[in-house]
Amino acid sequence: MNKKVIVCDIDIVRKKGISYFQDNYFWPVSEHEYKDFVNFSTETYNSLLLDCKDNKVFDIMLQEYQFVDTIQKILHYNYVKNYSHEHEFTMLYGDQTKSLFFPDWEKFSSVFFKTTTRYTEFILFIKRILKNIIFNKFKFFLKKVLKPASELNFALCIGSMSDLKKTYIYDNEIYCDHKYWNHIINSKIKVDNELDLNKYSFVSSYLDALKSRNDLFVKGVDFRGIEKTWLKRLSEISSVYDHLLTIEKPKTLLVTDQANPAHKIITIAFQRSGVDVVCFSHGNNLAVLNQTIIHQFVISHLKKYVVPNETIKKNYEYIYSVLPIEKKTGTRYLSLNIPNINQYNNCQKKQRTFEKTKIMLIGFPANTNRLTDTAGDFSLFKIDLEYRIILKLKSLGYFVQYKAHPDRLDEISGIFNQLVDEYISERFENVINNTDLIVFTHAATTTFGYTLASNQPIVMINVKGNPWNELTYDALTKRVHMVPAILNNGIRIEFDQNYFAEKIKVAINSKYKYVANLGV
């Protein structure tokens, strides 16, 4: 192994080849170091947030979890850069990580107004009209619009039409006006650049806390540039927030895609104005993992969050209702009382016969994100692991399928295409029945929840340290065949390949019953 080289991203793995990556496998930031840093960063920000007494500043701080996440990601790569300089490593990186090693903080100064859209305002208007007709059902649409406005059960809707949202709308006979966020937030909003810096002192307090660590994460970081950029962001967010408080609003707002920055500020401002804002889960997150950090970033600003059924609701409440932030925001979990997701998703395994046993490996997103709540969930760690899993499955004579995420094809393309028997890029819902068994290396994906709700055999590479929800873990182990794994030196996932092979055999021949307290 050439210890003087650090392969920094998937671009280099693709360019140099998977064997080169294996021969030079190394990452300077261990799991323990990274978790320690992110926990410190998040807890510092949370403390400032909880101490905030100004409602507007509190709301904007909720919004700016997004920028905290950006800072954490960039400082992760700053550690790598500093380590390579101190220990005379050569960093090999491509376009994927170049902007993280050499960040242009100014590009983060706008949250809404520098965002490009695929469609013109006119096209968005036409799409809005069509969505209103299609999703409200044409007869239902005509029936409702002929009534006086006072008799309509009306709601404004933003975000995609998920199955949960659709069920909620139809069950409650809601006439939904579907809008794109661009119809609510537009470039005509005047940005007031005169911030009361005393009110927004959390910026300097948070950054000073990071600087005080004096470690490789923060060495050489342009904190003045970060602060300047952040204050510009806050000016824009503050102006948009004030605008949203003053515009005419419906009684009810229905929201999906809550992580979208525009959806988030609309949700927060409308909630503050007394609008009944109802938000919807993706539908396949059963809360079998405790993902507190990402949950706070994406969900904890909501007052109402709808999940499929009472069991899943209890799973969420058990983990997240104790969070101080959710106690302050008043987050409530609501159930649609769907008996089980299996019926809801209609993903029962069909009878079929393959000439050769097919095993589908679910690929990890090959991006630059490193998840903190879970163990070993970083693309370079997972590429290394997936390669060894593929080789083992091939050596056992199985037909190996690699399932790439449809939105991540450019990232993973060219890595495993020639190694596996079938490279799958279709939606998972369309291919779940085209295999004999599914292997996961991570559970922080809605694909895992969707598979739990089927009767497909599942084998999970379970890395030590995964924060399973203790309320559901016993039931989960009756449904999923767990293969224990560790993070060697905090950077390489290792598991017993013979035990893995045995688990594959057992899982394929098992019969599955749905486990009630998983909510499937």
Predicted regions and their residues:
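Catalytic-core helical/loop segments in enzymes performing group transfer/polymerization on anionic/lipid-linked
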Residues: 1-520
